[in-house]
Amino acid sequence: MAQANKDTWSADQYSKFLKDRTRPSIDLLAHVPNLSPKRVVDIGCGPGNSTAVLVDQYPNAKISGFDTSPDMIRKAKETLPNVDFEVADLQSFKPDAPVDVLFSNAVFQWLPNGKRIEIVTRLMDHLAPGGSLAFQIPYNLNEPSHASMREVAGMPNKPWSETLKRANISRDQFPSPTEIWDGLKPLCADLDIWQTTYMHVMENHEGIVEWVKGTGLRPYVDPLDENAKKEYIETYLEKLKKAYRAQNDGKVLLPFPRLFVVATKA
């Protein structure tokens, strides 16, 4: 699933919540109509957790995966040594033959603002007739977990203020279901779009920080020195404690909306 700042992804950090991160892949694959594909590609395969779901579902298919992160690919190769993995970039992806299933778990949100529909529709060109593009993305930029990142980043006179202003790390919400429909439907025999909000159970508020350290928090803390990073995370944590109340047993529920799309080519 790695695409942004490709050299700083940590497979170990991402894998701390691997069961929760894998569940959307299982839910997405359940809606893919292709029962016996010959060629399957996992776009942004991460440490191979989503690829393992594909291997279980399609034991007779030729399955491959790619990711921009060398560390993610290293972990994927360790996990699934019989699958072809490579370090590659989605924007330059061009398979040598049509693919039956293009699968992607939590990657397309990292595509450049304004080019997402263009890139996604271009992927349809790589499908065999009747093939499916299936992808899932976090749809949570307006959730407190992510809004708080931006609020802390925008605070004036902080050790991180100038660094993050220069980093220009703003990211827009992925296009809406109606925009996705208009972009993809002319290319599809069938188009299925839905949204699910998962309720992830965190041990405490620090658990939310650990979750987002593996993904959405990275662009904010990676450019900072250790002292600025520590203070940024402490300030961010205080905002989380105000936004998410602890349950009676001390656990914290993290609502996590995700958008799913299965586009089947005519």
Residue ranges and their predicted role:
Residues 1-41, 49-53, 75:
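Conserved class I S-adenosyl-L-methionine
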Residues 100-115, 139:
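A short SAM/SAH-binding and catalytic strip from SAM-dependent methyltransferases
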Residues 49, 170-266:
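Conserved Class I S-adenosyl-L-methionine
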Residues 9, 93-94, 111:
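Helix-loop segment at the mouth of the active site in Rossmann-fold oxidoreductases
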